[in-house]
Amino acid sequence: MTQLPGLLDTEAIRKDFPILDRQVHDGHKLVYLDNAATSQKPRQVLDALSEYYERYNANVHRGVHVLAEEATALYEGARDKVAEFINAPSRDEVIFTKNASESLNLVANMLGWADDPYRVDHETEIVITEMEHHSNIVPWQLLAQRTGAKLRWFGLTDDGRLDLSNIDEVITEKTKVVSFVLVSNILGTQNPVEAIVRRAQEVGALVCIDASQAAPHMPLDVQALQADFVAFTGHKMCGPTGIGVLWGRQELLEDLPPFLGGGEMIETVSMHSSTYAPAPHKFEAGTPPVAQAVGLGAAIDYLNSIGMDKILAHEHALTEYAVKRLLEVPDLRIIGPTTAEERGAAISFTLGDIHPHDVGQVLDEQGIAVRVGHHCARPVCLRYGIPATTRASFYLYSTPAEIDALVDGLEHVRNFFG
């Protein structure tokens, strides 16, 4: 068994994840390497969800009966846990959404409806990057189309890093908002937040960070990031699907208009006009994802019990080992950084002229689950002249043995298409 420095006790951790005991395709042990798409869920989260529905299920904020009060306490307690997890100055800065995509769309639409000085219009510019997930491209394209704003972006270097050589020309006095990913879901690249934020602040632009591939894997401190908005999702960090988070600075949330209207987000309503509740409820129209928020709170408890610093060290050791092993495979090309420095635990690659979908299918027959395609980042594939990639991604329960199984599986793929 391969021993690496900094590894967690994966034997103990894996006992918390029932699905990892599954066998697939005629008895092959499941090797789950698709964690950038979604993580598996520990029993502690599954139990929290079951307990909520069995004992506390009710609508929140709208009743004086015991179930409503208990459900509200659990829901708002989850908000407290998120605020502490990301070191938010105030719990009222934590908005629950259904996923990171909705969080980013919320920011774009708030700015589209805002009054000065936040309004995005035909005289302003929006800056993103070429490595973004479609969820951090399309909302800004829609906003630019609707307002006439100009959309600009940073390109990529050949080794999968952001090209910031022209940062002063891209982020200018016309820039209203800069939105970028903290860790790329396709390249694995960890971006230089400080340099981008510093330039944005120099010109008075707002900063929005997509932390979907960071929040599950490393300590996340929104105050240290010095961003104005930070978005992430729950299902990639051991939580259930259907729950996302948008953190925003209090003064911005007070000034910016709501996007969705409905129950709970109002203060008063007449047939002539409405006034709105303070944040975060101003941005949480209708019945919220109560059970999902409770599940996210349980996931945060679980991650905290292990320690985000330890999870980061574990994944760094795995990534370093995986890069080394993958580069030993003939004809394999890593798309993105080829070292473990300043990168996350998602590695995309091509294998000669074998289409990634064929690679993924043959690996699946061996019980190895990877992701194939554009990974909702088609501009990256266009930049590197490839139709798609195969992506392996790791988490706190991943092991060196699973990386070895992947490498052995790729040899089988090469022989199969030999």
Curated annotation (Swiss-Prot):
Name recorded for this polypeptide: Probable cysteine desulfurase
Enzyme Commission number, as recorded: 2.8.1.7
Family: Belongs to the class-V pyridoxal-phosphate-dependent aminotransferase family. Csd subfamily.
Top EC class for this record: transferase
Reaction(s) catalysed by this chain's protein: (sulfur carrier)-H + L-cysteine = (sulfur carrier)-SH + L-alanine
Positions bearing N6-(pyridoxal phosphate)lysine: K236
Origin species: Streptomyces coelicolor (strain ATCC BAA-471 / A3(2) / M145)
Coiled-coil spans in chain: none
Listed cofactors: pyridoxal 5'-phosphate
Gene: csd
Signal peptide: none
An annotated Gene Ontology molecular function: pyridoxal phosphate binding
